[in-house]
């Protein structure tokens, strides 16, 4: 699986925290980008593809962030957060959640990111691994938001990137599970085109002001736009 534009965009844009979960981490790109952007963060990446997890672990071990990034091979539906049964409500004091250790003890994350499977009704690719990575059969949107609701701290932020074809369905599923859309960024490839993908941030509570804007990746000369260059400057040589 190659490094994709969607992963680069989300890894450069998403809000971070002290304990970050990357759902569908693939080869570890977004996990590593979040670790680089947030030097104090502990990052956990989960994916159900064993080969992708193996490659992600190799990439993590070759990075400067090996002590802060962990890769687990499992489905979101089976992931326990910290391998413990405690919940945030079971902690004796709210102050315990003010550190990465407190979040881990509670089995929750204050930032979750995902570049989720997005093909809903299209024909499946004969390459089973590519199908798994791209088709919602492996992680329906309802299951994704249910998992995020279980694992996100009360004040945490969930960020995702989805193509324009499914953005309305994605937001609708978030509402059903009680989330509020707090930030929306449409991304055009070039100025004359309509947005092909949307980056979205959700919270468990309404947050003001709501942010919505559209950005362009490439300028008229085919170079990275000022916006794209700015958000990715620490990742590109």
Could you describe each region identified by the protein language model?
Residues 1-16:
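S-adenosyl-L-methionine
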Residues 3, 138-195:
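Conserved Class I SAM-dependent methyltransferase catalytic core
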Residues 10, 115, 144, 202:
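Residue-level signal for inorganic ion chemistry
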Residues 12-84, 102-126:
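Conserved SAM/SAH cofactor-binding pocket of Class I
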Residues 87-100:
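Long, intrinsically disordered low-complexity tandem-repeat segments
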Residues 116-143, 147:
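Mobile active-site "lid"/loop adjacent to the S-adenosyl-L-methionine
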Residues 192-237:
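SAM/dcSAM-binding transferase cores
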């Amino acid at each position: 699986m190659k490094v994709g534009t969607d992963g680069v965009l989300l890894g450069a844009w998403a809000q971070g925290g002290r304990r970050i979960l990357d759902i569908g981490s693939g080869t570890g790109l977004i996990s590593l980008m979040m670790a680089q952007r947030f030097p104090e963060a502990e990052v956990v990446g989960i994916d159900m593809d064993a080969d992708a997890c193996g490659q992600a672990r190799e990439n993590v071990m070759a990075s400067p962030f090996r002590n802060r990034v962990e890769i687990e091979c499992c489905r979101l539906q089976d992931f326990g957060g910290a391998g413990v049964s405690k919940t945030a409500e079971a902690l004796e004091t709210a102050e315990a959640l003010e550190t990465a250790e407190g979040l881990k003890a509670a089995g929750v994350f204050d930032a979750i990111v995902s570049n989720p499977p997005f093909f809903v009704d299209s024909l499946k690719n004969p390459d089973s691994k590519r199908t798994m990575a791209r088709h919602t059969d492996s992680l329906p949107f309802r299951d994704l938001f249910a998992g995020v609701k279980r694992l996100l701290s009360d004040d945490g932020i969930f960020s995702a990137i989805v193509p324009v074809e499914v953005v309305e369905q994605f937001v609708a599923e978030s509402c059903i599970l009680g989330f509020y859309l707090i930030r929306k960024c449409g991304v055009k490839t070039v100025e004359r085109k309509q947005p092909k993908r949307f980056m979205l941030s959700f919270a468990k509570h309404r947050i003001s002001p709501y942010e919505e804007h559209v950005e362009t990746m490439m300028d008229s000369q085919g170079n990275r736009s000022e916006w794209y260059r700015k958000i990715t400057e620490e990742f590109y040589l």
